């Protein structure tokens, strides 16, 4: 098996595991980690496709996605902490609206 195909299969597996975590889990922190897993799967696919094409565009875009993901984690974790302090729990199925 070609190494690029293995990278693409791994990236699809990472994305699907992350998607399953977003759909199944109710803990907000686990959903946030699953979202990051999905983004890492996309990044791996971008870098693998970039290796096939022999360009650096995919690597630059993957770096940009990592930067945006870091900001997403900071904002998401801040919201989760605020919800936990306000409501006393962090389960996503029990929080239906942000306003009281």
From Swiss-Prot:
One of its GO terms (molecular function) is quinone binding. One of its GO terms (biological process) is ATP synthesis coupled electron transport. It catalyses: a quinone + NADH + 5 H(+)(in) = a quinol + NAD(+) + 4 H(+)(out). Keywords: Cell inner membrane, Cell membrane, Membrane, NAD, Quinone, Translocase, Transmembrane, Transmembrane helix, Transport, Ubiquinone. It is an enzyme of class 7 (translocase). Belongs to the complex I subunit 4L family. This is NADH-quinone oxidoreductase subunit K 1. It comes from Aquifex aeolicus (strain VF5). The lineage of its organism: Bacteria, Pseudomonadati, Aquificota, Aquificia, Aquificales.
């Amino acid at each position: 098996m070609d190494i690029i195909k293995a990278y693409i299969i791994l990236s699809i597996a990472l994305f699907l595991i992350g998607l399953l975590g977003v759909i199944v889990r109710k803990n907000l922190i686990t959903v946030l980690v699953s979202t990051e897993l999905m983004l890492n799967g996309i990044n791996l696919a971008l870098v693998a496709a970039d290796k096939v094409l022999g360009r650096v565009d995919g690597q630059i875009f993957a770096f940009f996605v990592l930067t945006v993901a870091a900001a997403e984690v900071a904002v998401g974790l801040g919201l989760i902490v605020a919800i936990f302090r306000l409501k006393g729990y962090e389960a996503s199925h029990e929080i239906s609206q942000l306003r009281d």
